[in-house]
Amino acid sequence: MIFNIGWTLLYLYWRIFYTVPTESGILSLVAGIALLVVEILGMLEAFVHYFNMSNIKYPKLPKVEPEDYPEVDVLVATYNEPIEILYRTINGCVHMDYPDKSKVHIYFCDDGSRKEVEELAAQMHVGYIKREDHKGAKAGNLNHAMSLTSSPYIATFDADMIPKHDFLMKTMAYFADQEKKNRELPEEEQVHLGFIQTPQTFYNPDLFQYNLFSESRIPNEQDYFYKDVQVSRNKSNSVIYGGSNTVITRRALEDVGGFYEKSITEDFATGILIQKKGYICYALNEVLASGLSPTDLKSLISQRTRWARGCICTGRKLHLLFTPKLKFAQRANYLASVWYWYASWKRFIYIMSPILFATFGVMVVRCTLIEVLIFWLPMYLSSNICLKMMSHNIRTTKWTNVYETVLFPFLMIPTLLETFGISMKKFKVTKKSGSSEKKDRTWYYAIPHMVLAVLSVIGIWNCVRWTFDTGRIDYFVILFWLISNFYNIVMSIFFVMGRKAYRKYERMEVKESCEITNGIVTACGMSQDASEGGISILLKEPVDFDDEEEVYITIHDHKYEARVRGRVVLVTRKGDLWKYVFSIDDMLQSKSEYIYIIYDNFTSMPVNLDESSSSFDDLRLNITGRTPKKVFQNRKMARIPIQADVKSESGRKVTIENYNYKYLLLSYAGERLNGLSLPLCEGLVLQLSYQTVIGDTMYLYRIMNYAALHKDPKKQEKISQWIREYRFGGTMQYERKRSLKKERVLALDEFSEMNSL
């Protein structure tokens, strides 16, 4: 970090005094100064971040006696969100742990006055608060709820944010502990907590992860802010109130007049006002709740526009630059937060600067290749290394550039208007319905990026041509700059192109013990992932679950048990195990428990960048991911490799190649047999009917007496014993050889059915 700061200061000295094109015309001078200004401001922002990250303060969870936990009101603000989203959230709330649950008061704060929300509140046995007017938007809604409740602490959740079972236990402990300490201190020595902010994470891939085919390669775009930036601000008491997943003291809210209603980012403003009053606020880096990230580009742009306008408006109205009630470190952090939203202009200038020179012949920076290698390169490399190290491999400069390039065309005008006091009059709630836009409705969002791509290609061509014409390598600097920007632009175009959404429900990684039964056989296994529409379970042995019949699945976690009804939709191999995927047709009487188990176990999004991936991989994935794929298989019964020589009742010798309970693949020489009876062991005979030929000597037969065998528990046990004998009895090497041949095919459709569940 010190090395980077030193090189950055040296670089700035060189840039300020030696590189501004003062003799190349007014356009060059303006462009050169604009680039220099955004570089200086960006580096000041980086220095603030370096200061914060130099000695991070992680609040230690205190030990609190059960009787010391105070009363708390849980407010879930809603306006027009779908009922199924509200159900998940309130279900998470009612399952939160607390020593005395009578001290937890949960309320729907309904700004839409909807009958169905009131009915849901009654069904879940929680409070319901509505209001007839919408004055003050979300802040007004929460203030109205405050006037009707009385607990000393208030937990706020957005309508889609599902708390985990330990949310209150891991947030309220700080307040309870501080209360106890304050009782032993005189008033002037007491420390009063304002709020505890926990990360806002998401159980669905955000648009950057999903549209760029990187769900398993990059963390959620917001993770860096909530898990690193926020926690780093603890030591300066400048943690930003994020509006959800937070516990606030009623006293602090009353001291600042409630939630701030004069900004469309009421959370940002309210947090600043609380800290102005001297309250101490902490951010935690442990995920205690998860929500639904915007699922379409229009909603994402609307959300970021509101955040940008709201932060700039708040900075202006609360006089962040000159207020005496904030310490210098607090002012610096909040000003950096406001400046962050001008990244759209910074990104535009970074992209246009090399284009101005290479495409239009306008000089922006006056320098030589040697100077760039001496002053810029060490600063650039050390900055990249610092960001990666300080972010704990959550964020890199490359991905920051991609995120900014995607959004900058849509934020430039709103931030400019807000800077001059032309504010957004109407509060827009971010759409979070789980549906996605059609690709043909979003192409026009890519027009700015397409124009810049064309200009960049022209500039790249000119640099290459000039290099060959002059024999000089000075143009390599501009060429590198253009290619770097072009990569970001191409990734932005890929992002805007979107990606078709197949899933109706988000699928979570859930590893819990399960039992499956059809009333004839019962199998025990371990779940792998689950959604509201389906679940996949690993079994040690194949089981005869008919895809045309219903099965009952019981899933257990450390506290609850859920029993649901479904049917098998896909069976594949996973190593030496069998993966059964079931659709869920009915949650029976276990909906609350099943929903809780799914969302409380949320762990499936990546928390770090995939270090093995490169920019080439990013482009390759986005090209191949958009290539139509064929699904080769859709197996709903386990296909079991077998190598058993058997004689039919007529004396014909055949070899069983594989078996899936309903069909049998045989190989034999000689005349084709249209039908035969095949005894596998004593008391177990298969009645076969010819279906088709595969190759020269392989024949597929249907098992005509499958229904009778399937419904007979004794026959089922004989079949299982026969499979174990011939699958593992000296044939493992043969089986593995056959499995490897099919591995590529199976991998292509392993989750094909689950994609829609």
Please name every model-derived segment.
Residues 91-103:
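Short, acidic, metal-binding catalytic loop of nucleotide-sugar glycosyltransferases
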